Structure formats: C-alpha cells, structure tokens
C-alpha cells in the first residue's frame, strides 16, 4: 500500500459505542447504533450524556439533569419557550455558567429546562455555534477547529 502526505491527519473512526476521538482542538463523535450522535458534556462540573441536536436552538436539559446540576425551578416558571415538531415546548429558560466538551469550553450558555417529555438532554446551537466547525462525514460528527 502507498501512503500520501496530507496537511492534517484524517479522523479515524473508533467503533466502540459512544467513544469520542480527540484531536488537537476538535472531537470526532461516532454515529451510535440508532443513527444519532451522543456526547459526554460537563455542565458546571457535572457530567451528563447529551444527544447532539443541530436543530435545537439552545441546550435543552431534562428535569433530572438540571436538578443534578443544581438548577432549581418552580412550576410557575414553566412557559412556552420554543415551537417543535409536536407543538409548543414548555420549559424554564436559564443560563449555564460553563459548558465543556473535551477541550471546547463556553461560558454563559443559553439553555432551557424541559420538565416533561424530554428523555435525554440535547446539546443545541447555543453551544454548537461556539465550537467552530460542525461537520458530519464518514468518520462521524466533527466538532471544533
């Protein structure tokens, strides 16, 4: 076999379920068996697994994840915060102090707590827009420079 020189090494797929590969300043998330991409994200120092959702305008937290992160709310704080495929989405708008995915970190990130109907927290555009590149290719989803 012959090798060709490249400016940067091509990402290599790691087949282990939900195992991310790190390169300098970027992460490659493998496609899970269900076709989606998942990331282990730290919010204010608390790690949780999120579904990467490029169609979500902000991070959406399940009630359990929000509580584990120390975010509390009253039922009276819940209001229509977005419109999804199934109609209005009800939640509580908040700002997350620090969101980190590997070396990629953002502060003051908009989010919503969705008390009902959300099975897994969503990593949306309020974070993804800050990572630089978001691309999907044969190796997986590439986040970062």
Regions found by a protein language model. Give the residues of each.
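Pepsin/retropepsin-fold aspartyl endopeptidases
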Residues: 1-49, 54-145
